[in-house]
Amino acid sequence: MLTENQKNELNKKACKIIKSKGIFKTEMLKKFSPSDVEAIRTSHNLGHHDDSTILHDFESFIDENTLTFSFKLIFMLSMLRLADKEGEVNIDSLIEEYRRFYIERLDRGLPVDRPNCAYNREFLDDLVKVKRSILSNPFEKFERKRFVYYSKDLNILSFHPVLWEQMTQETKDGIRDKEREFLKAYYEKLGGL
């Protein structure tokens, strides 16, 4: 068992190593006991989020429907449509599904999205740009909340395994229906779907 002085020395060495690697800009890493975490959560009115709440958290996030563009809607509809039994999606297949929606709008003479959207024919024909766009937004919005992951080596996007396991077919259908309704409402002022 380490003495308090030994713990402090180890912590100082660890902080020096971390600082020398440029990982953190501060010299000390803050550590919180479970009771401190609970007190902070309570004082800031923060909810408890873990695997037991992930499905509820996901459904709440979908219900928020906070949109700048239609990207999150098309992304999630594509993910649900293409996911295999493990909740995994080949990113190349997702890119094709995603861009097809916007290209079809262009082909029909409809606005792709709001006026300041970067998606035009040239952009959508550049698969590298589309992939980069998907991974920065909308994917990142879902990843930040631990709902989806990206394996660059395998070229796969995946739902969080616990989330996927908890989603019944009825749940997936309900989310799909909501997203379609949100999409319909979103495009109402942009020439409809």
Question: Where do the PLM segments sit?
Answer:
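Intrinsically disordered, charged low-complexity linkers and terminal tails
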Residues: 1-193
